[in-house]
Amino acid sequence: MLKKIPLVVVAVSLLATSCSDQTTIYQDNLTDTVVTENDATVLQPSVSFSVAGVLDIYEDDAPGANGKGAADTAGNYPLSLVAQVSPPNSLLTASHVDVEGDFAYVSYNVVNETFSGAIEIINISNPHDPRVTSRVVYRNADINALQYHNGHVYAVGGVDAMISDAAPSNSFIAKIPVNAGDFSNLSGIIYGFQQGFTANDVFIHNDEVLVTSGKDGSLTVYSQNDLTLQDEFMYADLRSLSIRGEEIALLDASQGVKVLDKKYKTVREININTDFGPSTKKTLKFHDDRIMVSEAAKGTGVYSLSDGALLDYIPIMVDPEGVSPGDQVTNAVATNDGLLMMANGGAGLSLTEIENGSSKVVGVVELRGSINYVASKGDYIFAASGSEGLQIIKMNRPAETLVDRCSDLPEYTGSDKFSVNVGESVAYSGAKRLNHIVNKGALLLCGSWSIRNAVSIEADALMELNGVLIVGRNNGRKDITVKKGATFKIEGDMILYGNLKVEEGATLEFLGDSSVANVFGDVVIHENATVKGNFEDVRGKF
């Protein structure tokens, strides 16, 4: 159901005093109209599984359409695309994502001079079935970044103050009430305006809200409670901020990184001579005793926090080939347990291992769209991918309890074309990407395994899985076939983008009480085959 809320600014509302008369707080609304949508039948078609499934990684030694390394060995990082969430309309592009609890909060803007934006809330509590629960569309304002905190979304962006009676300046922040995944009380929105062409980043810190607002803008500090102005500091060209403990890092495109203390005094400066591009957001991230900086065409700069020394440049890998040099820019960085993710615009999403002070480029993830922003939490990566919207990626790392059970098994390091001969009995652990599996003997796999092509358990063979098995893609379906007299035992998750065929005399057995079968194709079971055990049939195919 659509609700159109007329936006009438209350002129006598909460005028904040400050060192700048540009910084003003308004209780009520911003532009001519805001449109909300909470109807699941309208929202859910935004979620697409059309290209869900196994994601390849184009590796450093052989970038290209086949996605293979030179030796065709099994790859690490068995990633899978869970789903895509398309933008609310064809003009909008995903700009930022924040993940908190069971929900992801996604912002959208327009890349040209037109002002338009949106925010969506996505329920990710069921990793197999994400759902858009609520949406708010700003018809005359960009939303460039956001953060959820304690029942509110704090969103920042830009509006054309020349044509909006409600906006004393282009750069704004909105505090929007959220209840159980819904935007349900837009009359309670509070707005603040600060100097700068457009606000580009926001961070909740203790009981304050920090906002950066680009060229000729500021670092503005608001009260979290009611957006009362606390302080404002002018900077030439702020692009983003990052906070760890009481350390605050600012990226100023005119100079480099400034590290502030809790009183917003500069305690350290890192000079960076990089062309960050005009009016484009670039993020930075604390990591151990270093700071990672998105440096546009240069990739990611790694700097020492203690003395500001440049320690490393992590380059931009390109796949597919032929991407325009102007589209090869690092826009954002994120880290997760020793893995650096770089949002490289048209050059895609790249992965680099960063441990013990060294870096090793893994490759480029097989994704569509220009990657504007990346966030990672738990076992997931969330990529804001321009016109492709939000892409939800599962890392499929084995659970700690599973790792313990698999600890006595050797890690698999062989070919990505996995074959077991008649009479052979093999058992491996790992988190690997494979081309295919042909099993004619006895095979135990423990861990997480993604398979680009088919899995065939030949006549009278045995295959046991303890962990996660993902096969195929929804736009390139592949089958699992359990042939005559064969047995397939599963303790964990089987995610199949294709058909499951259980032939005469074959057995499919689910062990334990929490196994999952998520089959996107058909399940074909011979009348003399056996399926037993307790499991969750996600798509009702059995």
Residue spans of the language-model regions?
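Extracellular beta-strand solenoid repeats
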Residues: 419-421, 427, 438, 444, ...
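C-terminal motif of bacterial Sec signal peptides marking the signal peptidase cleavage site
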Residues: 15-18
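Feature marking well-ordered beta-strand scaffolds used for ligand recognition
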Residues: 20-416, 431-437, 451, 476, ...
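Sec-dependent signal peptide recognition
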Residues: 3-9
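Generic cytosolic/nucleocytoplasmic N-terminal low-complexity/intrinsically disordered segments
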Residues: 2-3, 477, 482-483, 527
